[in-house]
Amino acid sequence: MLPSCYANGSMLPDNEELVNSMLANPDYLRTQVSPNPLAPSAVGGAGMEGLMCGSFSPAFYYQGIDSFLALHNNIWGLPISFLHNSHRPEKPPFSYIALIAMAISSAPNQRLTLSGIYKFIMDKFPYYRENKQGWQNSIRHNLSLNDCFVKIPRDKNTIEDNDSAGKGSYWMLDSSASDMFEQGNYRRRRTRRQRHCGHPNRYERESGKDSNDGNSSAAEIRSPSEPLSDFDIFCNERPNYSDRITDLHRQYLSVSLGFNSLFNNEARGLRPLPEIRECPDDVDASSSSSKAMQSSMELHEELHSPSAFTPPLNRRETSSSGAPVLAEAFNGIKDVVDAPGSSPVASSNRSKTTLFTIDNIIGKP
């Protein structure tokens, strides 16, 4: 059976009033705590009546928690976030691209190293002074993946202001992306643009020499007396990746054109067949059929010869001469036929005995 104090709640004061009274005077809990009534010295001569709840001090039930309750008068009404660090600065409402652009624009020479960008962000925005590894990785990714930022090689022998050592490279804003952020509003970002250098690259300059439009290409080239900026020097030394791929594709097409012409019907129709000498009147009809078979096999050997797959050095020479370069493969056959001292009959007999024809297979005389 429970003690009477648990059955009748009127004997104890209200819990809320008790907590408020203890918070108002925290020393009350320490001074009013009585010894444990359940100790042997306390219950030695007392009966069950001495163990009634009414004989305990109210502070007995709350001892040990006064230091926690004394933190705040309304601690139980505070949110859970109060237990965390509530003094961390708020995250700035700017993207990483905007932070990088702000850092580079604030530099005197409009260029900064990677460590300089880190320093600017941490000095201006205290939020980024913690968890440096996470946001610094994001800064590096945005520098390498966006065309609005240009990496400029740095001279290791020169040390500028605010630079501890000549290491790393400079980062600059692309001149073609100057209008990406409108009126200093770094929250907006336009569609990603592809960077184009102001000067023609090496491949365009070589092609411009062969073309007849020399005046137009010369107008685009800046005069030698005008100084070049770091960005222009960087573009001249390193052409765009897309331009290099385009030039490689152009070279591949020029080489593969020789292979495609072998299977073109129009080019095949223009290819002359090797000369076949007229046989004497005493040769029968079977020899004429063997000659036709011989010419077809020679054409097959022409298409499958290694020289047929050699691309022509110049297409103009091939088209102007009228005879393709593949006709050189028959020079050996023509030399045998046109050799001095050989008669037409001897050449026809040699072709009958050496060629792999249907007549030789069936053994027809």
Curated annotation (Swiss-Prot):
Regions of compositional bias (Basic and acidic residues) in chain numbering: 201-212
GO (cellular component) term, any one: nucleus
Biased composition (Low complexity): 285-295
Swiss-Prot/TrEMBL keywords: Developmental protein, DNA-binding, Nucleus, Transcription, Transcription regulation
Localization: Nucleus
Residue ranges of the annotated DNA-binding region, renumbered to this chain: 90-181
SMART domains: FH
Molecular function terms from GO: DNA-binding transcription factor activity, RNA polymerase II-specific; RNA polymerase II cis-regulatory region sequence-specific DNA binding
SUPFAM superfamilies named in the record: Winged helix' DNA-binding domain (SSF46785)
Disordered: region residues: 183-224, 276-295, 305-324
One Gene Ontology term from the biological process aspect of the record: anatomical structure morphogenesis
InterPro entries listed in its UniProt record: Fork_head_dom, FOX_domain-containing, TF_fork_head_CS_1, TF_fork_head_CS_2, WH-like_DNA-bd_sf, WH_DNA-bd_sf
Signal peptide segment: none
Organ and tissue specificity: During embryogenesis, detected in several mesodermal tissues including the hindgut mesoderm, the ventral intersegmental 5 (VIS5) muscle in thoracic segments T2 and T3, muscles homologous to VIS5 in the abdominal segments, and a small subset of visceral mesoderm cells found near to where the gastric caeca form (at protein level). Expressed in embryonic posterior mesoderm.
Feature: compositional bias, Basic residues: 186-199
Function field: Transcription factor. Coordinates the placement and migration of various organs during embryogenesis, including the salivary glands, hemocytes, germ cells and Malpighian tubules. Likely acts non-cell-autonomously to provide signaling cues from the mesoderm/musculature to nearby tissues. Mediates salivary gland positioning, at least in part, through activation of the secreted signal Sema2a.
Protein name as annotated: Fork head domain-containing protein L1
Organism in which the protein naturally occurs: Drosophila melanogaster (Fruit fly)
Organism classification: Eukaryota, Metazoa, Ecdysozoa, Arthropoda, Hexapoda
